């Protein structure tokens, strides 16, 4: 079984935040090393500094590449300038440079087939900006680098509670003009496919939230529901995608109606993430769906306010590891099923004789 362990590439994120703390705390539990082979892309020197400062009992090996990572060990690939300094809670362009270097190396080794999935620790979206990185965040960067032309979908999840976003990191004033029928349909299709292939749900039920208060109140508070969202949903229903709504976000979330669906599609960032984080901040996971690569991250940021104090909970990061493993395994099973589709055997009655007929499962 050892050779079948999933190799998880972990990017260090912002070295002045809680990234190393949650990584080291997660893998201080020996049972985590039985599930996967974790490889940190970062700095052994920085990792050792965090380990000592936070008094975390986690050992690691230094390797040149993920191909050298040993079983039942946490490994660190050095891809950061040894002179970089850790200054807890301080936004620093050098820390941003180190975060980008780790991300680039992880992507490079993923392309080489040395790791199976990527789990990213939080970055500072300001200090990482450079000529090489001009994106709002991880999601858009990874879509550009590893998407192969596919569009991504941001999903925040905890167990069966999954919230996806039509629009992500854009100003509120641009939301209404950005949302189109085509964009909603694109996100619904990705969400539907993800729920089936990545989470093994046979017939996913998706709830769609409205853009305007009270779902537009019959046009009194806006026409986007009537002119964009509902027509988009009707066309998707004709293609076999099960979607309901649009629901007013406040009543839908406040009533607990979200528990009756496999996924919820929100129109914009805070509409989806505010209730999600209120309900599942501690161990929620950010999953980037729709791409060939499996990428997850914890649902929190750099948490500068508690960096270096030993107060950060590793629960969300641990769940990000679990989700990456589960999705990768589900995709492998899906791939195997497509290569060797199950065959149905049934008898067809003809002229008082039974004829064995073989049929293959629809490949969707």
Swiss-Prot record:
Its EC number is 1.1.1.262. It catalyses: 4-(phosphooxy)-L-threonine + NAD(+) = 3-amino-2-oxopropyl phosphate + CO2 + NADH. It comes from the Bacteria. It is found in: Cytoplasm. Its cofactor is a divalent metal cation. Binds 1 divalent metal cation per subunit. Its main location: cytoplasm. A divalent metal cation binds at residues 169, 214, 269. Catalyzes the NAD(P)-dependent oxidation of 4-(phosphooxy)-L-threonine (HTP) into 2-amino-3-oxo-4-(phosphooxy)butyric acid which spontaneously decarboxylates to form 3-amino-2-oxopropyl phosphate (AHAP). The active site is located at the dimer interface. Homodimer. Belongs to the PdxA family. This is 4-hydroxythreonine-4-phosphate dehydrogenase. It comes from Bacteroides thetaiotaomicron (strain ATCC 29148 / DSM 2079 / JCM 5827 / CCUG 10774 / NCTC 10582 / VPI-5482 / E50). The gene is pdxA.
